[in-house]
């Protein structure tokens, strides 16, 4: 039915144009695919082709094109009006039938669907409300009963009542259970919400109480505490270092005061003996022989006691330096017989242990041989002044065994900064004790020759007979040395040539030493350990010297410190030493004339030191002032090699009044500012004994601090102890 409706609808909606002529269709013809053509057009097309022009479907006599009934054609006007009316009527009837059949089919389908819908609704009701179902069933039962009241049975009614009662009970129970379940469900929902909130709270609390979070806080707190403890430890270490330094300074001051007190006591005792010795005059030279021998023996015992604490190479070398002065004194003695008549023999005891030249002179006077002085080499202690601090040996240099014959090391041993203490250099370091014993005689002879050449010139120019100047200037060349020999009168030219050549060699060695001062790290560590051991050894030696030979130790400490805090103590300290040196050297010089003594009435002291070429430029304006009441000064030449600082009043005056005047009124030794600022790299071993008080104290304090700082920085054992 629907198929026919579609066909009818298609027929009513056929196109009205031809596919071939594209005009209004006349006598329409349809192919199998319902393509409309004009009958005339398709006939012409089929003459040449056997396919549909639109879809290429073959058009054969078995499958021809079909004509449409009721289509407009040329023959229509030929039909009558009644015929056309009947044709239209037949077409409408056909269409009406088709539509009616289709309407009937649709109505049947609607009825079937309604019945199915009712059945489904009834099923839903029975499922959702069983009571209504029961009531519905009862109503259905009542209707038949009502219809058939005669057929109702009382037994069935009772049975149905029982069923109804049981059903009601079940319903009530189920209803109560449903209510309880609803309440339980509400409670569970509330509990679930509370548990969810508790769970969230616990999660947040766990996050807040995580060990990592508190661990970070704990680590930060511990780190801050550790840093605080480290800062406190560093502060305490610094405070401990400062306290150690302060304690060391106090100990050094205490030792300094002890030495100064001992020196004052010794100087007072010496000054009490000095006026009595001066009052005897030159005629008492024969009577002073036994006291001199006694003082010499006492000094020898003190020197041997203090020398036992030093190393054997240093003691033998220092004794050799004493023997050098013996030879230099013996060389100049025959040239000055007038000194023996004019000046008495030496009568004053000396402050240091340098008694070898005096003993040599006495032995030569009494007919002794120089060979008798040989045993003194092992017992004598060379009079090098000890430091005022326990670190006097900390300035020693550590020399390698192969450098023991190098003159550079020997020249460097005499170098000394102006405000530093003296330095000792142990020149002899042998690989074995046998080698030291084998080479000892050779080294002694070589050292005697060198030192005699170096120090002989100091004896030659000690005093000058000229009234205008009391100091002599020695040049480095041989010509000026000869001029000095002519002015003095009895100095051989060979001695000055030797001194000039020796000094030039020593100065060149000093320059090479300054260029080779670089050290490796291993040598620096060895030097640090050596300085540490030397400081310990020096403290032991100072204790032993104080216990065994207090007199000698006091003299040596006074000699290093120079003048004490009072100027009178300084003059008394320097006076006997000048008397000793004068008594030792006055026999080797011509006698001073009376004109030389009375020329200006001024005492013009000079210093005894050794100058390097670098220091000649610094000492061009070097001047030595006279005593405080003279007011005049004397300028020394820049090429001065040896200048000896002694007072003529100390050597020539024998009256007690002059000694008292020197004791209380005059300052015999004053050095200008140029002398104080001058730093001579080479000095004589006894030149530091005549340094002024202020310079000595400043030098001792600065040297103490420098030695302590160097030991604290360089010594590993010192660092570990601190």
Swiss-Prot record:
Sequence positions bearing Phosphoserine: 210, 522, 549, 557, 564, 566, 715, 717
Record protein name field: ORC ubiquitin ligase 1
SUPFAM superfamilies named among the record's database cross-references: RING/U-box (SSF57850)
Q: Where is the composition biased (Basic and acidic residues)?
A: 339-359, 571-581
Q: Where is the composition biased (Polar residues)?
A: 323-338, 541-555, 698-722
Q: In what way is this protein post-translationally modified?
A: Auto-ubiquitinated.
Location of the protein in the cell: Chromosome
Q: Which SMART domains does this chain map to?
A: RING (SM00184)
**Which CDD domains has this protein been placed in?**
RING-HC_RNF219
Q: Which GO terms describe its molecular function?
A: chromatin binding; ubiquitin-protein transferase activity; zinc ion binding
Q: Which residues form a coiled coil?
A: 87-129, 157-267
Species, as recorded: Mus musculus (Mouse)
Q: What is its EC number?
A: 2.3.2.27
Composition-biased stretches (Low complexity): 302-319
Its domain of life reads Eukaryota
InterPro entries recorded for this chain? OBI1, OBI1_RING-HC, Znf_RING, Znf_RING/FYVE/PHD
Which residues does the annotated region (Disordered) include?
273-359, 541-585, 691-722
Indicate the quaternary assembly.
Answer: Associates with ORC complex. Binds to chromatin; association is cell cycle-regulated, absent from mitotic chromosomes, is associated with chromatin from G1 and partially released from chromatin from mid S-phase.
Q: Which GO terms describe its biological process?
A: positive regulation of mRNA splicing, via spliceosome; protein autoubiquitination; protein monoubiquitination; regulation of DNA replication
Listed under GO cellular component are: chromatin
Catalytic activity as recorded in UniProt:
S-ubiquitinyl-[E2 ubiquitin-conjugating enzyme]-L-cysteine + [acceptor protein]-L-lysine = [E2 ubiquitin-conjugating enzyme]-L-cysteine + N(6)-ubiquitinyl-[acceptor protein]-L-lysine
Annotated zinc fingers (RING-type), start-end: 18-56
Record keywords, A-Z: Chromosome, Coiled coil, Metal-binding, Phosphoprotein, Transferase, Ubl conjugation, Ubl conjugation pathway, Zinc, Zinc-finger
Enzyme class at the top of the EC tree? transferase
Role description: E3 ubiquitin ligase essential for DNA replication origin activation during S phase. Acts as a replication origin selector which selects the origins to be fired and catalyzes the multi-mono-ubiquitination of a subset of chromatin-bound ORC3 and ORC5 during S-phase.
Q: What is its main location?
A: nucleus
């Amino acid at each position: 039915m629907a198929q026919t409706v579609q066909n009818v609808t298609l027929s009513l909606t056929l196109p009205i144009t031809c596919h071939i002529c594209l005009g209004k269709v006349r006598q329409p013809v349809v192919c199998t695919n319902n393509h409309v053509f004009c009958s005339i057009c398709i006939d012409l097309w089929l003459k040449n082709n056997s396919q549909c022009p639109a879809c290429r479907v073959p058009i054969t006599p078995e499958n021809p094109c079909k004509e449409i009934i009721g289509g407009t054609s040329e023959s229509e006007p030929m039909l009558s009006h009644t015929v056309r009316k009947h044709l239209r009527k037949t077409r409408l009837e056909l269409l009406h039938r088709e539509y009616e059949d289709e309407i009937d089919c649709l109505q049947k389908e609607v009825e079937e669907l309604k019945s199915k819908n009712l059945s489904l609704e009834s099923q839903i009701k029975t499922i959702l409300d069983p009571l209504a179902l029961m009531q519905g069933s009862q109503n259905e039962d009542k209707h038949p009963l009502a219809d058939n009241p005669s057929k109702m049975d009382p037994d069935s009614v009772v049975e149905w009542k029982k069923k109804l009662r049981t059903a009601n009970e079940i319903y009530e129970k189920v209803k109560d259970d449903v209510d309880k379940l609803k309440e339980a469900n509400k409670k569970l929902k509330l509990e679930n919400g509370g548990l969810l909130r508790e769970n969230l709270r616990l999660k947040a609390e766990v996050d807040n109480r995580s060990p990592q979070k508190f661990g970070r806080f704990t680590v930060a707190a511990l780190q801050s505490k550790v840093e605080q403890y480290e800062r406190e430890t560093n502060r305490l270490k610094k405070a401990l270092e400062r306290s150690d330094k302060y304690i060391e300074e106090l100990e050094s001051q205490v030792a300094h005061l002890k030495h100064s007190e001992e020196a004052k006591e010794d100087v007072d005792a010496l000054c009490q003996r000095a006026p009595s010795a001066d009052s005897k005059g030159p005629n008492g030279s024969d009577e002073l022989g036994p006291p001199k021998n006694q003082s010499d023996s006492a000094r020898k015992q003190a020197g041997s006691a203090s020398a036992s604490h030093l190393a054997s190479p240093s003691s033998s070398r220092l004794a050799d330096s004493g023997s050098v002065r013996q030879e230099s004194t013996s060389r100049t003695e025959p040239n000055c017989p007038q000194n023996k008549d004019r000046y008495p023999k030496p009568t004053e005891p000396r402050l240091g242990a340098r008694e070898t030249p005096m003993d040599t002179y006495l032995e030569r006077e009494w007919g002794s041989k120089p060979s008798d002085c040989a045993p003194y080499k092992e017992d004598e202690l060379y009079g090098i002044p000890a430091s005022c601090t326990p670190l006097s040996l900390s300035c020693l240099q550590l020399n390698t065994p192969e450098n023991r014959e190098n003159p550079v090391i020997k020249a460097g041993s005499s170098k000394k900064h102006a405000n530093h203490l003296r330095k000792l250099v142990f020149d002899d370091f042998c690989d074995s004790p046998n080698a030291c014993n084998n080479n000892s005689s050779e080294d002694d002879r070589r050292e005697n020759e060198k030192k005699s050449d170096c120090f002989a010139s100091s004896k030659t120019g000690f005093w000058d007979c000229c009234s205008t100047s009391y100091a002599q200037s020695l040049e480095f060349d041989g010509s000026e040395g000869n001029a000095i020999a002519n002015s003095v009168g009895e100095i051989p030219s060979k001695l000055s040539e030797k001194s000039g050549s020796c000094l030039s060699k020593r100065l060149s060695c000093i320059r090479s030493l300054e260029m080779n001062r670089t050290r490796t790290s291993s040598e620096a560590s060895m030097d640090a350990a050596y300085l540490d051991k030397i400081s310990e050894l020096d403290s032991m030696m100072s204790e032993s010297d104080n216990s065994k030979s207090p007199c000698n130790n006091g003299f040596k400490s006074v000699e290093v410190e120079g003048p004490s805090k009072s100027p009178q103590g300084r003059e008394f300290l320097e006076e006997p030493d000048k008397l000793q040196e004068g008594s030792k050297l006055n026999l080797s010089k011509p006698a001073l004339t009376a004109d030389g003594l009375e020329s200006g009435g001024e005492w013009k002291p000079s210093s005894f030191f050794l100058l390097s070429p670098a220091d000649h430029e610094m000492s061009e304006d070097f001047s030595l002032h006279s005593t405080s009441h003279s007011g005049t000064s004397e300028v020394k030449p820049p090429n001065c090699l040896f200048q000896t600082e002694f007072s003529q009043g100390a050597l020539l005056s024998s009256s007690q009044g002059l000694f008292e005047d020197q004791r209380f009124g005059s300052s015999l030794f004053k050095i200008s500012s140029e002398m104080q600022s001058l730093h001579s790299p080479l000095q004589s071993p006894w030149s530091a004994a005549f340094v002024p008080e202020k310079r000595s104290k400043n030098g001792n304090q600065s040297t103490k601090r420098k030695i302590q700082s160097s030991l604290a920085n360089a010594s590993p054992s010192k660092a570990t102890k601190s």
